[in-house]
Design a protein with these regions (language model features):
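Conserved phosphate/pyrophosphate-binding and hydrolysis machinery centered on Walker-type P-loop NTPases
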Residues: 2-3, 36-39, 135, 242-246
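Winged-helix-like regulatory helical subdomains adjacent to P-loop NTPase cores
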Residues: 106, 113-232, 236, 247, ...
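Short, cationic-aromatic polyanion-contact patches
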Residues: 238-258
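The catalytic "switch" region of P-loop NTPases
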Residues: 23-25, 33-134, 148, 152-182
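Glycine-rich phosphate-binding loop signature in dinucleotide/nucleotide-binding domains
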Residues: 18-22
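Short glycine-rich substrate-engagement loop in P-loop NTPases that contacts/grips substrate
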Residues: 1-14
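Short, conserved clusters of charged catalytic residues that mark active-site
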Residues: 8-11, 45, 126-127, 219
Length: 259
């Protein structure tokens, strides 16, 4: 859509909220997937709709932007030349950037039980442990490895006792797929590289961690905060240190930054 069309849609959403009489939240999944020019056009329309909003012409209560690009990276592109806040509230405010946490080990086990019920694919205990150790519950990595297992296994055999189709992937198969991901130009890992591309301070911090240095967690540190919000870093189990989110990211970043 053109920018005027996007603005018309935003104003329409405001009318919907007004008629509902309830707060309306708009969630845009993969908001950064379209060409950058289109993404910027849509987000500028949100700015315009917000600037026009009042009691008689409301805008939506909130907009959730879900994607790989940290929304702070778009700020300069959204602000026209000379658009400074000068102490007042900016029209482009991100109330809270959030990196959705990965699955806990308990949640991953629960997901795999449901997966086994639906698909007949029952990972061995060692395979479940390997999946956890490799991914640390990162949802895309978990999903991708399970998908690849499905592709490799084909139609599961049927158990003579229950007549259910059953197959049991091994830890070795999980390990092989995880290593295979590093050799693919998959969009997810490329997006991990985009997070640090051209950001010298982020690269330096990651290289320190890759070198085995212990780094204390500090949300006040802008570089740490950026990498935590982007999902590349996570707090350690003790909550005292930062660490790279999972071994797959670690191996990818080592290859990327070591070149």
């Amino acid at each position: 859509p053109t920018e005027p069309q996007s603005l018309s849609f935003c104003l329409y959403l405001g009318e919907v909220q007004k008629r509902l009489g309830k707060p309306l939240v708009l969630m845009l999944d993969e908001y950064d997937a379209p060409p950058r020019k289109l993404t910027i056009s849509i987000l500028r329309s949100f700015r315009s709709a917000l600037s026009l909003a009042d009691d008689s012409r409301p805008f939506v209560h909130a907009v959730l932007l879900c994607g790989k690009t940290h929304v702070r990276d778009l700020r300069d592109e959204l602000r026209p030349t000379g658009d400074e806040t000068r102490g007042s509230g900016s029209l482009w405010n991100v109330g809270l950037p959030v990196a959705l946490p990965g699955l806990s080990q308990h949640e991953l086990d629960s997901l795999l039980r449901d997966y086994a019920t639906d698909s007949g694919v029952v990972l061995t205990r060692e395979a479940r442990d390997e999946l956890w150790q490799r991914t640390r519950g990162q949802p895309w990595l978990v999903s991708r490895i399970l998908y690849q297992l499905d592709e490799q296994l084909g139609s599961p055999r049927r158990s003579p006792e229950t007549n259910l189709a059953v197959s049991s992937p091994t830890a070795q198969q999980v390990r092989a797929i995880a290593e295979q991901l590093l050799g693919e130009d998959c969009v997810h890992l490329l997006s991990v590289g985009d997070v640090v591309n051209g950001r010298k301070e982020a690269e330096e911090l990651l290289l320190r961690l890759l070198g085995g240095e212990e780094v204390a967690l500090s949300r006040a540190d802008e570089v740490q905060s950026y990498l935590l919000d982007s999902g590349l870093l996570t707090a350690s189990d003790t909550g005292q240190r930062v660490e790279i989110s999972n071994p797959i990211y670690e191996a990818y970043l080592l290859r990327l930054l070591g070149d």
